[in-house]
């Protein structure tokens, strides 16, 4: 977790993430950024969904490197949360090779539970504090 409403993550780029020979697949990098930006919602304790995700691939990301992703919230208007991120090679202060911008929309917790598998719901019933971390008012079958 970063200093304010921001986070820093390390993404190890392995052979499993390869697209073109020796390089990370852009779709998998997009996934990593969506996850990092989505984790910002935990800092707000607000369940949310990705409404928009824009990625700028500035330089190739080689297999065997570590991508340092820093994400921050840049604004909030009602249920809309705006955020940005960048990915750097060579360390947290290294060269920026990927940039992202996103819009998340805060939704009720039930949005996630309506299609959840039965075993997932059962696990939540056993451990309700998992959801209370995000939404302190939420209860399963109150």
Locate predicted features.
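A generic structural signal for short beta-strands and their flanking turns/coil linkers
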Residues: 3-9, 27, 49-53, 67, ...
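A short, contiguous structural element within a folded domain that forms the immediate neighborhood
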Residues: 16-26, 31-43
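Hydrophobic beta-strand-centered segment that forms part of the acyl-chain substrate-binding groove
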Residues: 35-74
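Catalytic strand-loop segment that frames the active site of acyl-thioester-processing enzymes
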Residues: 1-24, 138-142
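Residue-level recognition of well-ordered beta-strand positions that form the cores
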Residues: 10-12, 54-56, 70-72, 86-88, ...
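Preference for short coil/turn "hinge" residues that link or interrupt alpha-helices
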Residues: 16-17, 50, 54, 90
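HotDog/MaoC-like acyl-thioester-processing domains
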Residues: 61-63, 74-142
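Charged, low-complexity, helix/coiled-coil-prone segments
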Residues: 8-14, 27-29, 109-111, 115-117
């Amino acid at each position: 977790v970063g200093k304010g409403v921001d986070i820093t993550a390390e993404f190890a780029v392995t052979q499993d993430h390869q697209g073109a020979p020796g390089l990370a697949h852009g779709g998998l990098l997009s996934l990593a950024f969506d996850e990092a930006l989505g984790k910002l919602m935990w800092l707000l304790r607000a369940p949310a969904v990705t409404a928009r995700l824009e990625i700028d691939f500035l330089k190739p990301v080689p297999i065997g490197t570590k991508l340092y992703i820093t994400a921050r919230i840049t604004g909030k208007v009602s249920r809309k949360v705006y955020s940005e991120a960048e990915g750097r090679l060579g360390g947290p202060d290294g060269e920026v090779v990927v940039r992202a911008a996103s819009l998340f929309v805060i939704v009720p917790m039930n949005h996630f539970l309506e299609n959840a598998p039965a075993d997932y719901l059962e696990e939540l019933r056993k451990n309700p504090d998992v959801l209370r971390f995000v939404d302190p008012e939420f209860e399963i079958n109150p």
